Amino acid sequence: MSDLLSGSLSHDKVTRFLNGKNLSSKDLWEFIKPEIRKHEENSGGVLILDDSIEEKPYTNENEIMCWHYSHAKGTHVKGVNIISCLIRYGDITFPVGYEVVHKDILFCDIETKKVKRKASITKNEHFRNMIEQSKKNKIPFEYVLADNWFGAKDNLEYINSLEKKFIIGVKSNRTVALSKNDKLRGKFQKVSTLDMKDGQSIKAWLKGIEFPVTLIKKIFTNEDGSTGTLYIVSNDLTSGADHLYTIYQKRWQIEVYHKSIKQNSSLAKSPTKCVKSQSNHIFSSIIAFCKLEILQINTALNHFALKYKLIVRANQIAMAELQNFREGVA
């Protein structure tokens, strides 16, 4: 890299950067704020939140590089757990906040007698804090979208208290009442036991929550041909099931983000070993994603196409240089 940039960037300069200022979500916002203001829309914006684990099985353990439960794998894995908050307007998506889960409390597990870690700030607390910060930053959004791992009672109540709409997944064992009278009498049943057709929506009351929600059931087909059932809830009682599900599908853009920061922004290639440098590397990967997104807007090429185009062009130049060497020898 130093040779490529004629010495303007050195290994020592990168090392000093990674071990310098503690870079955070606040710095991300300062960087991306001008782009958000350029593309923001007063209606139709969706705030998307989700977490992802970058596995690092061979890196020394610390408060961010530790064991986390992976709901994708159904087991605990060693790595970094990052919660991200994205804003989406049409086809444009930018991260506006992120938090790295810090398991900064050591405790002894009574059953196993082993020392374990837990976080002083939970993922659900980070979830609510990032929504609050987005509102403070005056980011226009109409809906909050998340999967069922963030469908906790406190999260739904918090979003509703902000007078914002949510469309969030709930687990199949969540219990609901089908009328206000049933709610008052304590007559609740699991959503999985409800006689609902694919795409159907009903008005329901989640246990422990005062306000009613629209409950939607969707049946989907997996890549292996098996089928699954998705339940989502919304405090938007005026929109139909098809409209709400169409909006909810915008949530999948965060999966593209997770894939891109891992494969195109070198999130997984951090050689750092201490918390500060590891955290600053994560920040740098997210900034790189933002720059790729800006290029995508300007070129109409997605991140993977941009990367492929650069690799092809670099190889063409290398092949031409190789040919020059051969002709020189001849």
Name every feature range the model reports, one short phrase each.
Residues 15-16, 67, 148, 265:
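Flexible, active-site-adjacent loop/turn segments at secondary-structure boundaries
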Residues 3-17:
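Short, basic interhelical loop/turn and adjoining N-cap
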Residues 43, 60, 92-94, 98-330:
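Single, function-defining residue in the core of a domain
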